[in-house]
């Protein structure tokens, strides 16, 4: 892996900003690379809530670009954020989930041939409970209004009818993490934009420098509309999903003929398959094979994403055929991760204890007393019952 000393600043900047949807304050990055002539320090944070899904391949390909550009990359396992987000991760399981996320991220990166020796993992609670951090939370809460905090977390924190106060603390902590992790830049999905702006606008008021922000596009979910989400099982494909289940989910995914705008499958090819192929085989390499049945024209290989996208738009590539290719490609990506999980006891324990399967409680039906009539000894006479019922009437 190249270091900043051997990577040309322009080449490094190109790698850092490649395939991103938006960059805030790019001049900060250029100043570090061209003027200060040092490694760019950045972090990517993830809250260990639901099980990671295939959408995580998008930030993983960017971590690969950052490392190739010589960046010092920190992965923040934001355990307290997971707890604060409407208690998506209860405290008794959050430590196991953080470990599960760490092992999953390492497995993904290894599966796409990315060296991870220079990757640093930090658990949020290791510094977020210190006196200095706590005091800065108080200082920041004395600057940021309730409305600003709520708006900042609107696209990230789970929205409910009666929101908890924790949802307002969440974006303040994410802003402060930039200072306490000592970075020049924070990377995240475009859904984080409002939190990034909150950090830019308010950290200088505490005497801290403004950071740059990098945003990747969000991979659409399998259903129509919405993003792939760890907390919505119907929108995602789990990284440990069995091959048959992957095909079943892909076959039921929304995919309208000729529609290239609202197409989660094409987006997955564009933002996951294509970048991974470039990582493995070099720049501009693209080869997408579809094992199409002979009666529909036989197998076909596309040599560029644009060619494939145009074929779908012109309805030369049908939704069923696209689904065949995407399901096969996903299963090929997931196989080494499944294998690593199967051979790693620590990985399995983190999964078992982080995501315990609730055992349904069998409720015993209350036995109804049999009506034995009025003949058996001690039975209440029918006319006596009628009298008592009459007495209870208001």
Curated annotation (Swiss-Prot):
Q: Which reaction does it catalyse?
A: tRNA(Tyr) + L-tyrosine + ATP = L-tyrosyl-tRNA(Tyr) + AMP + diphosphate + H(+)
The Phosphothreonine modification is found at 359
Q: Which residues carry this modification: N-acetylserine?
A: 2
Q: Gene3D superfamilies recorded for this chain?
A: HUPs, Tyrosyl-Transfer RNA Synthetase
Chain positions of motif 'KMSKS' region? 227-231
Q: Name one GO molecular function term.
A: sequence-specific mRNA binding
Transmembrane stretches in the record are: none
Q: Which residues carry this modification: Phosphoserine?
A: 235
Annotated positions binding L-tyrosine: 43, 170, 174, 177, 192
Question: Upon deletion of the gene, what happens?
Answer: Inviable.
EC class: ligase
The biased composition feature labelled Basic residues covers 362-373
A Pfam family it matches: tRNA-synt_1b
Tell me where on the tree of life, at the top rank, the source sits: Eukaryota
| E.C. designation(s) | 6.1.1.1
Checking NCBIfam families in the record gives:
PRK08560.1 (NF006330), tyrS (TIGR00234)
Give the similarity note: Belongs to the class-I aminoacyl-tRNA synthetase family.
Miscellaneous information on this protein: Present with 2710 molecules/cell in log phase SD medium.
The free-text function statement in the UniProt record for this protein reads: Catalyzes the attachment of L-tyrosine to tRNA(Tyr) in a two-step reaction: L-tyrosine is first activated by ATP to form Tyr-AMP and then transferred to the acceptor end of tRNA(Tyr). The specificity determinants on tRNA(Tyr) are the base pair C1-G72, the discriminator residue A73, and the three anticodon bases G34, U35 and A36. Also involved in nuclear tRNA export. Also attaches D-Tyr to tRNA(Tyr), this reaction is about 150-fold less efficient than attachment of L-Tyr.
Q: How does it assemble?
A: Homodimer. Interacts with KNR4/SMI1.
User: Protein name, please?
Assistant: Tyrosine--tRNA ligase, cytoplasmic
């Amino acid at each position: 892996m190249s270091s900043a000393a051997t990577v040309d600043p322009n080449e490094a900047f190109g790698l850092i900003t490649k395939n991103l949807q938006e960059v805030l304050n790019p001049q900060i990055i250029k100043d570090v690379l061209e003027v200060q002539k040092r490694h760019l320090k950045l972090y990517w944070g993830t809250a260990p809530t639901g099980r990671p899904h295939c959408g995580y391949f998008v930030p993983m390909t960017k971590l690969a670009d950052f490392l190739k550009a010589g960046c010092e990359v920190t992965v923040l396992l934001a355990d307290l954020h997971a707890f604060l987000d409407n208690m998506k991760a209860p405290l008794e399981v959050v430590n196991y989930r953080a470990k599960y996320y760490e092992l999953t991220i390492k497995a993904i990166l290894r599966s796409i041939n990315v060296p991870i020796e220079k990757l640093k993992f930090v658990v949020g609670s290791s510094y977020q409970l210190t006196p200095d951090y706590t005091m800065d939370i108080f200082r920041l809460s004395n600057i940021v209004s309730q409305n600003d905090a709520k708006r900042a977390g609107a696209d990230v924190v789970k929205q409910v009818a009666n929101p908890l106060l924790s949802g307002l603390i969440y974006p303040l902590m994410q802003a402060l993490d930039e200072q306490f992790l000592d970075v020049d830049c924070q990377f995240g999905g475009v859904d984080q934009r409002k939190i990034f702006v909150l950090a830019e606008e308010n950290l200088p008021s505490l005497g801290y420098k403004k950071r740059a922000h990098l945003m990747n596009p969000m991979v659409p979910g399998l259903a129509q509309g919405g993003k792939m989400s760890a907390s919505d099982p119907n929108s995602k494909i789990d990284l440990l999903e069995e091959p048959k289940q992957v095909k079943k989910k892909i076959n039921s995914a929304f995919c309208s003929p000729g529609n290239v705008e609202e197409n989660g499958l094409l987006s997955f090819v564009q933002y996951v398959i294509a970048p991974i192929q470039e990582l493995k085989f070099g720049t501009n390499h693209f080869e997408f094979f579809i094992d199409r049945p002979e009666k529909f024209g036989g197998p076909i290989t596309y040599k560029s994403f644009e060619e494939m996208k145009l074929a779908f738009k012109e309805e030369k590539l049908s939704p069923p055929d696209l689904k065949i290719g995407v399901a096969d490609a996903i299963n090929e990506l997931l196989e080494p991760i499944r294998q690593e999980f199967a051979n790693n006891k620590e990985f399995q324990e983190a999964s078992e204890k982080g995501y315990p399967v609730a055992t349904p409680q069998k409720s015993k039906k209350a036995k109804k007393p049999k009506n034995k009539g009025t003949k058996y000894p001690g039975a209440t006479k029918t006319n006596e019952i009628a009298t008592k019922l009459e007495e209870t009437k208001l």
